Regions:
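Hydrophobic alpha-helical membrane-embedded segments
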Residues: 67-77
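Interhelical loop and helix-boundary elements at the membrane-water interface
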Residues: 1-6, 21-62, 75-176, 181-188, ...
């Protein structure tokens, strides 16, 4: 119980402090809603580090993620009813933040249970999520600014661009490869191949996912490709 409370305190402190700082910066510097959206995106990604470091066993992290899922609905109800808070973010479609947050937390729970609980490897939790998260955040910014060549494929989201998807692929590859090197147990050539295949699958998932579903789809796709390949190459 002591370990669980300590881990929960660390993870909660990170989330509260990071969000408070983001809101403070938004109020003081008047950054755009889109910039704040991406800031919160990276704050959520950062929460996986205390989640995988502060807890000593996987089921403590899974319980923490489950508690977050139980709390997020009333929190978002309050968010929508407090003028100071509801004015911080502009939804691109009705229920965007509720849906995105719920999917992000379910992705957190799934990756913790499968990668850490079943496979016994907390590093693969980070690799599965960061295969999507970092690239998605950067690719969105690149795509909006430089995405002049839209992907003309019937299964792809009409808003996706070649430039954004290439950026997604590069960031996904680098994220997975870096974490595999830190983790160890995989040769350099195998790490490159695993990272490239995981990045390609995640980029394809992000390209086809619509209405924010990439938040759940992409980490799951990355995990589905990454875990068998790591096992195959003796990791």
């Amino acid at each position: 119980m002591r370990d669980f409370l300590l881990g929960s305190s660390v993870a909660t402190a990170y989330i509260v402090i990071a969000i408070a700082l983001a809101v403070l910066v938004q109020r003081l510097c008047r950054i755009s809603s889109e910039a704040l959206r991406k800031t919160l995106h990276f704050i959520l990604l950062g929460s996986y580090i205390p989640l995988t470091v502060a807890f000593s066993v996987w089921w403590h992290a899974a319980i923490f993620a489950s508690v977050l899922i139980a709390l997020v609905f009333p929190f978002l109800l309050i968010l929508n009813r407090v003028p100071l808070l509801s004015g911080l973010l502009v939804e691109r479609w009705r229920g965007e933040y509720f849906g995105s947050m719920m999917m992000a937390l379910f992705a957190m729970l799934i990756t913790v249970c499968v990668c850490w609980g079943y496979c016994g490897d907390r590093y693969l939790v980070l690799a599965s999520v960061y295969a999507w998260g970092i690239g998605d955040g950067v690719a969105a910014l690149v795509g909006r600014r430089y995405g002049n060549h839209k992907i003309l494929w019937r299964f792809a989201d009409a808003h996706k661009s070649v430039e954004g998807s290439l950026c997604m692929l590069a960031c996904s590859f680098l994220s997975v490869f870096t974490l595999l090197i830190i983790r160890g147990g995989i040769s350099m050539p195998a790490g490159i191949l695993i990272s490239l295949l995981t990045g390609a699958a995640t980029t394809l998932g992000e390209m086809c996912a619509r209405n924010g579903l990439d938040t759940l789809v992409c980490p799951t796709v990355a995990m589905g490709v990454l875990l068998p390949l790591v096992r195959l190459f003796g990791g």
